[in-house]
Amino acid sequence: MLENQLNLLDKLFEEWKKTDSQEFGSDSHFAFSKDGIICSDEYGKNNPKLLFIAKEPNAGGVYNSDIFWIKNFLTDKSQKKSLFSNRIVMMSNCYYNTDLGYDVLRKISYMNLKKTAGSSRCNYNNLKKYCANEERRKFIKREIEILSPDLIVCCGNDVKKILYNIFCNNINYKLICVKHPSYFFISNLAYKNDFESKIVRKRRK
């Protein structure tokens, strides 16, 4: 089943990449960044499937379509950690009730709504325009369908608003929304407590 998911994702990304290249051309600053399943050996294995959805890749000056940045933490332990990545790990360990550090990323999936690199601050109008394209709306829905998550975590309210727009306010997935993981005006403890409380409420439904 998982091998089929990976094949479906590859086919989807090829179509998606063609659509993006028609708009952005071959400019390396708009290289298409694949995402999805982080570790094919672990995703969904005796666990509920957790999907984090963010706005766009933050390339940090490196534009390479072969780089799935969050996956690199598993192969390059020296890679610099960020507040964003630390909180993705924190929420994942909290959700699975584990203490695996960054290895917990093997259990989850991760996707960006926009597949071309952004900067340190997302331009929301550009993001809305990107996601308003009818083909891309289908691609976003299709990727979520392939990943078939038991829970979606929206990384920021902008993500939630766009998803509700894409699904016409009829999302058939369990979904919670957290503050953007890079939001530094809240402590990690308060951030974790907020995530836990939302998980508890969602599990009661």
Residue ranges and their predicted role:
Residues 48, 149-151, 170-175:
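A short helix->loop->beta-strand "cap" motif at the edges of active sites that frequently abuts
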Residues 55-60, 114-118, 157-161, 180-184:
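Short, solvent-exposed loop/turn segments at secondary-structure junctions
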Residues 1-84, 139, 143, 165-168, ...:
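Active-site and ligand/interface coordination hotspots across diverse enzymes
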Residues 1-20, 121-141, 159-205:
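C-terminal capping/extension of enzyme domains
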Residues 47-52, 62-133, 198:
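Mobile, glycine- and charge-enriched loop segments
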Residues 140-155:
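Proline-aspartate-enriched helix->loop->beta-strand connector
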